[in-house]
Amino acid sequence: MKNILNFTLDELKDWMDKNSESKFRAKQIFQWIYKKAVFNFDDMSNISKSTKEKLKENFYIQIPNVVKKYVSNIDGTEKFLFEYEDGNIIESVVMKYKHGNSICVSTQIGCRMGCKFCASTVDGVVRNLTSGEIIAQVLKAQKEICDRISNVVLMGSGEPLDNYDNVIKFLKLINDEDALNIGQRHITLSTCGIVPKIKELADQKMQITLAISLHAPNNEIRKSMMPIANKYTLEELLDACRYYYRTTNRRITFEYALVKGVNDSRENAEELIKISKGMLCHINLIPVNEIKENNYERSKSKDIEEFKETLIKHGIETTIRREMGSDINGACGQLRRNYIRNN
């Protein structure tokens, strides 16, 4: 038995053809799943009984269960703990804006990257999610909020480029007009900086936004915060970023979590200006989320503002990330860890 959500439309057409079914049935099934949110073959009224039986013998539609749901009293952000059939739990977050609903999805159960400011990596990685398991987060969230999701952010638990093949398939699926039809420019992928995979992603020539978890203006600080920096230098990472925007003509976003006394000085800001000058980029400053397992403290609000103003004065487009759902353990991985610890 296979999870039908792991199939592209072309793959499902091929399966239909090889199993003596008309190829157009594949498109009908896609419409039921992705357009009408019907996750039971028996409820697909324009599919013949014999075809339904064949589908049930060969496929299932894996939609995770909601084990916990939290709704922010501040901004209406909805955070879900989803449980897959093997008992593993991940989290997804739906953020509501005037321009539409955005979902932050997880790409792995846990993470092996070891970034010191991130809760999802504390217990390591359990396994990769399949493309179907990632897209199921979007399908289930839409069903829960009774509204369409128009933007997708790959910033939940896991390193997307450490699960490259499944993530690429997921991106193509959600962009497919016969599936969720979410425009590539409404998709953001965040990575800690796996240099060869950034270049591979560039060669896909997608129009998604690439967000780099930079968090430091030099190799010394970055190595202290992110183990990946011991494998790829800042210079190698920036070279990959230049390749990405030359290939795709898409602006890079640099994410920079400000940690008190670590990377938030004026000198650090000036170093950041130096390495980002001349690049088609935007810097997103993030007040770091404090995690019990590390000793990082959030920079003071006035220091964050001063850091931002220093960058802006030198022509660097800079914003401070708006905190969504801060009253319900919004930091990546916090909800999952707390739930597992208490159950």
Swiss-Prot record:
MF (Gene Ontology): 4 iron, 4 sulfur cluster binding; metal ion binding; rRNA (adenine(2503)-C2-)-methyltransferase activity; rRNA binding; tRNA (adenine(37)-C2)-methyltransferase activity; tRNA binding
Secreted keyword on record: no
Catalysed conversion reaction: adenosine(2503) in 23S rRNA + 2 reduced [2Fe-2S]-[ferredoxin] + 2 S-adenosyl-L-methionine = 2-methyladenosine(2503) in 23S rRNA + 5'-deoxyadenosine + L-methionine + 2 oxidized [2Fe-2S]-[ferredoxin] + S-adenosyl-L-homocysteine; adenosine(37) in tRNA + 2 reduced [2Fe-2S]-[ferredoxin] + 2 S-adenosyl-L-methionine = 2-methyladenosine(37) in tRNA + 5'-deoxyadenosine + L-methionine + 2 oxidized [2Fe-2S]-[ferredoxin] + S-adenosyl-L-homocysteine
Enzyme Commission number(s): 2.1.1.192
Top-level taxon: Bacteria
Annotated binding of S-adenosyl-L-methionine, by residue: G158, E159, S190, S213, L214, H215, N289
Cofactor annotation comment: Binds 1 [4Fe-4S] cluster. The cluster is coordinated with 3 cysteines and an exchangeable S-adenosyl-L-methionine.
Residues bound to [4Fe-4S] cluster: C111, C115, C118
Enzyme class: transferase
InterPro entries for the chain: Aldolase_TIM, Methyltransferase_A, RlmN_N, RNA_MTrfase_RlmN, rRNA_lsu_MTrfase_RlmN/Cfr, rSAM
Primary localisation category: cytoplasm
Cofactor: [4Fe-4S] cluster
Subcellular location: Cytoplasm
Note: Reaction proceeds by a ping-pong mechanism involving intermediate methylation of a conserved cysteine residue.
Name recorded for this polypeptide: Probable dual-specificity RNA methyltransferase RlmN
Organism: Clostridium novyi (strain NT)
Gene this protein is translated from: rlmN
